[in-house]
Amino acid sequence: TSIFETAGVGQPAYATIGAGVVNTVFTLVSVFLVERAGRRTLHLLGLAGMCGCAILMTIALLLLERLPAMSYVSIVAIFGFVAFFEIGPGPIPWFIVAELFSQGPRPAAMAVAGFCNWTSNFIIGMGFQYIAXAMGPYVFLLFAVLLLAFFIFTFLKVPETR
């Protein structure tokens, strides 16, 4: 909700509900696409889309004072970010980890993946407000750079596992 408030959205609670709806819908979309498009392709698409949305969000926040309509662009960027997350980086890593490892080491690999996932979520959740206060409207560029790095890593190192 605070992200929507920063973006100048008049009713941030409704926008937050909208983000939840987008999250749910695109989780279902991912279920149907994963076998057709492939895990690696969806993961790359999701990372690229999230990176683009993070850049769009930065631009919208920078122009918000001069162009109040940028609050709508911010909503589109956030909804797009959530949608691309649910198409790729949300569910796909769990498929990849499960399919990269044979039956014996799979539980340990899944445990390490879960630990890394929840530790990262905790760090972002606890630190975002501080990073946002320090970086201002450029906070989403940090995410864009990280997403670009993850895209390059996935492109170069992660095989298709279906």
Curated annotation (Swiss-Prot):
Gene encoding the protein: SLC2A4
Q: Which family does it belong to?
A: Belongs to the major facilitator superfamily. Sugar transporter (TC 2.A.1.1) family. Glucose transporter subfamily.
Q: Name one GO cellular component term.
A: plasma membrane
UniProt function note: Insulin-regulated facilitative glucose transporter, which plays a key role in removal of glucose from circulation. Response to insulin is regulated by its intracellular localization: in the absence of insulin, it is efficiently retained intracellularly within storage compartments in muscle and fat cells. Upon insulin stimulation, translocates from these compartments to the cell surface where it transports glucose from the extracellular milieu into the cell.
Q: What is known of its domains?
A: The dileucine internalization motif is critical for intracellular sequestration.
Alphabetic keyword roster = Cell membrane, Cytoplasm, Lipoprotein, Membrane, Palmitate, Sugar transport, Transmembrane, Transmembrane helix, Transport, Ubl conjugation
Q: Name one Pfam family in it.
A: Sugar_tr
Instruction: Report the superkingdom from the record.
Output: Eukaryota
Localization: Cell membrane; Endomembrane system; Cytoplasm, Perinuclear region
Cross-referenced InterPro entries: GLUT, MFS_dom, MFS_sugar_transport-like, MFS_trans_sf, Sugar/inositol_transpt, Sugar_transporter_CS
Q: Which reaction does it catalyse?
A: D-glucose(out) = D-glucose(in)
Q: What is this protein called?
A: Solute carrier family 2, facilitated glucose transporter member 4
For the keyword Membrane, the answer is: yes
List other remarks.
Insulin-stimulated phosphorylation of TBC1D4 is required for GLUT4 translocation.
Q: Name one GO biological process term.
A: glucose import in response to insulin stimulus
